[in-house]
Amino acid sequence: MFSLDFSPLWPYWPTFLLGAWLTLKMTCVAVFFGLIVGMLVAFAKRARVPVLTRLCIIYIEAVRNTPFLVQIFLLYFGLASIGLRMPTFAAAALAMTINIGAYAAEIIRAGLESVPRGQIEAAECLGLPKWRIGWHVMLQPSIEKVYPALTSQFLLMMQASAIASQISAEELTAVANTVQSDTFRSLETYIVVAGLYLVLSLIIKLIAWQVGEHLFKRRRAIRLAAKRAGKAPPDPQRIDTVIPGGAA
């Protein structure tokens, strides 16, 4: 009769933790650069330059409508066939960055379009520089509105990093495949790996929450004020953002 036995896995705990660390590191690198790419593409798509807009549309549609596995294979095997070889970590992180960039661009673009035109015009009337209008009046409020969607996308990409095992990147799933082939304890191995992915997801959620608390102090102030008043906190997305310089 079958029974769970995790004892053969104990010697492999350092290997599991190393795979989890590589998965987390790969995700953090991809999220950082992917968010930058997403912001640039979102602004470029809104620019009144037809060629630039078309290029952004091609990039977004190509990434969003092709499998992530194929994208990794194109970068790792496709480029290698023309002499451009990359380490497995670099290829996986680059594919994840490109993927996150496309999805983040559309999420951020939706946030930018939700900023009232009158708010931007008011900032222009105050004589604010364009970079301040772009950052304080447009980007910050839009990021605050779409932050939960971005966080969910980052979590999905962390979980999709398991596909990197197909190019022998030594992340968590690749480690699991090696361990289960050594121990022949497939069920126990993948239970452990599922638990580690759950822990990684909770860590990323905690990091995202802390970052959100730091970046969006207005939301925190609204929540604390509502708590002191004994009322349910209002939706910060429905409250007009204060424009730097004193105008609302």
Regions inferred by a protein language model and the residue ranges of each:
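Transmembrane alpha-helices and adjacent helix-loop boundaries
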Residues: M1-A248
